[in-house]
Amino acid sequence: MDQFDLEKHFAEVNAALGIKKRSDSDESYVIDLCDEVLGELALRQHTFDFLRGDPSESCLSGKKLPVDAYYPNKNIVVEYREKQHTESVAFFDRRSTVSGVGRGEQRRIYDQRRRDILPQYGIKLIEISYSSFNYDSKKKIIRNRQRDILVVKRLLLK
């Protein structure tokens, strides 16, 4: 996925979730909290040469897989896990992929790839799930900054 495709994908995802701008998303909110706790601004949607998706006709080596947030001074990657990472969501899972599997299955494969590969390069992966916070019936975070920063501190500093 090139930068244009990535932005288009995020726009579709955000529209499906009723989010006007990416900066309004739960992912952005949680990463903002991580920035504060870690005292560093994350490189958002960062890619590494060694972390790649499955090969396709247009990219035989596989496209670089983005991570939600990378903190180079701490060598930490934070991945925010929305509900589509743990359950089937028709909007997200409707497309087939270059790998010949559904999007939900590909997401599981790529999530596991991050878990396997990042530590091999000395990068600590921290996964933060929406379920760590108070959330509504749509599994969106019910935001309470004071409470939420404590959740993020507990997860990042363990």
Q: Which stretches of residues belong to each language-model region?
A:
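Nucleic-acid endo/exonuclease domains
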Residues: 1-158
